[in-house]
Amino acid sequence: MTMQRIFGCAILNIRETALQATQSSQDRRDELDVCLAVPSAQSACEMEIGMKILLINGSPKGDRSNTLKLSKAFLEGILEIDKDAEIRQMNLSEKKIAPCRGCFACWNKTPGKCVMTDDMQEGIEGELWADLMIWSFPLYYFSVPGLLKNFIDRQLPMNLPFMEEQEGQTGSGGHPSRYDMSGKRHLLISTCGFYTAKNNYDSVTKLFDHVCGAGQYESIFCGQGELFRVPELKARTDEYLECVRQAGREYAQKQAISEDAKEKLRELLYPRDVFEKMADASWGVEKKSGEKEDPVLTFTRQMAALYNKDSFDQKERVLEIRYTDLGKAWQLSLIHI
């Protein structure tokens, strides 16, 4: 069985052989951790001590979320500067929040109060408490996950029913807030499975232009999000997480992220061709047939995708990788064309 990879001036052939050797790699998960302050009541006069932050984790994966790694890095940066910052984390995957019924009782029969009693009350209380809301979520089908959209829908009791456009909204109509939200700040942090975030978040930004007001929130959108769970790529993903951490430091100082930091955050983790080869190989199925392929071949493909074509010195080589525990081997051939 022979598969070909073409890298500019070289062809990389992958060929199975009947030999055995090196051990297959073991996954090593190095989880980022962040010290979350214990929620406690604070009076208005204590607000100057530290920022109050509500982290809304909209990933169905909960604490296993790839995006959450970025959000925690951002919080680490904030805590380096603002050691008195108080942080509450709300994992929507662990909450019982029913879909909005569209009954509008919260506007006329029980103003400001939903007729359903569930965990959404905790969310509304958290939003009223916080100075900064961090919306942490993966991109699902070019929008937010259903859990998060449900949470957004259930914010209806926070609005008044009257037609009144708010600052920064789109000009197509709106409803005024029931509460003074003028001092609230918002940050969107999201990862997606495409090689770039560019042009993939149009519907997300349109949604939050209505929710928060255009220009009234910051955002960190990162492509290649699945790489944050791959231990073998930790050196590169840690570099990116440090950029996110720096953005957190800046935000703690200026309540904004500098253009230099934003430019670094827009950088790709890997070039498009490298990432897409890794991504395609990760599914473990044949590209043409869609049938499941040998997992050893899948692993070999992923390694081959990281080959640096600029290092090719015009000398043809064969690299044989032996998986002794499985009794299999594959050859990678560099061929000048």
Residue ranges and their predicted role:
Residues 335-337:
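Conserved small/polar residues in nucleotide/adenosyl-binding loops
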Residues 291-331:
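Acidic, aliphatic-rich amphipathic alpha-helical segments
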Residues 11, 40-42, 46-47, 265-268:
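Short, positively charged and aromatic/hydrophobic N-terminal segments
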Residues 48-163, 213, 238-290:
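N-terminal beta1-alpha1-beta2 submodule of the flavodoxin-like/Rossmannoid cofactor-binding fold
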Residues 161-214:
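Short, glycine-/small-residue-rich phosphate/pyrophosphate-handling segment
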Residues 13, 27-33:
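Intrinsic-disorder-associated, low-complexity terminal segments enriched in Asp/Asn/His/Tyr and depleted
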Residues 4, 20-26, 42:
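Low-complexity, intrinsically disordered or signal/transmembrane-proximal segments
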Residues 217-224:
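Beta-strand-loop-alpha "switch" segments that mediate conformational coupling across diverse proteins
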